[in-house]
Amino acid sequence: MPRVKTGTVRRQRHKKVLKLARGFYSGRRKHFRKAKEQLERSMYYAFRDRKQKKRDFRSLWITRINAACRINEISYSRFMHGLKLANIELDRKILADMAMNEPANFAKIVEAAKKAL
C-alpha cells in the first residue's frame, strides 16, 4: 500500500485556521500554531460572552428604568410590583426604551403602577 502524505489536507486545515485568524495581531495571525491557540481562546470568549451579553443588557435596562422611576418618585422594586398588580405586561427592554425616549408616556405608566399599590 502506498504511503499517504498529508500535504493537501494539512494545507487546507492551515488555510482554514489562518483565514479565521484574520484581524489578530502579529504572529497570532501569521503562524499556524499561535493562530490556532488564539482561535481556540477567541471561540471560548465568544461563546461565554454571548451568554454574558444577555445579563449585561438586562442590567442596563434595570438601571435605566430605576433612574426614570426615581425621577417620578418611586423605587424600581415598588414600580415593578405595581406593574404586576395593575396587570401591565411590558418587559424591561420596552420599559427602558420608553423611559429614555418617551418620558411622558413612561410617567403615565408609573402613575398606573402607583394607583395599583
UniProtKB/Swiss-Prot annotation:
Gene Ontology BP, a term: translation
Alphabetically sorted, this entry's keywords are: Ribonucleoprotein, Ribosomal protein, RNA-binding, rRNA-binding
Task: Please name the PANTHER family in this protein's record.
Answer: 39S RIBOSOMAL PROTEIN L20
Which N-terminal residues, if any, form the signal peptide? none
Q: Which HAMAP family match?
A: Ribosomal_bL20 (MF_00382)
MF (Gene Ontology): rRNA binding; structural constituent of ribosome
Gene3D superfamilies according to UniProt? 6.10.160.10, Ribosomal protein L20
Pfam families associated with the record: Ribosomal_L20
**What's the family?**
Belongs to the bacterial ribosomal protein bL20 family.
Q: Which organism is it from?
A: Wolinella succinogenes (strain ATCC 29543 / DSM 1740 / CCUG 13145 / JCM 31913 / LMG 7466 / NCTC 11488 / FDC 602W) (Vibrio succinogenes)
Q: Does the keyword Ribosomal protein apply?
A: yes
Q: Which gene encodes it?
A: rplT
Q: What is this protein called?
A: Large ribosomal subunit protein bL20
What the entry lists under InterPro entries is as follows: Ribosomal_bL20, RIBOSOMAL_L20_CS, Ribosomal_protein_bL20_C
Transmembrane regions listed in the UniProt entry: none
- Write out the function statement from the record: Binds directly to 23S ribosomal RNA and is necessary for the in vitro assembly process of the 50S ribosomal subunit. It is not involved in the protein synthesizing functions of that subunit.
Q: Name one GO cellular component term.
A: ribonucleoprotein complex
Per the record, the domain of life is Bacteria
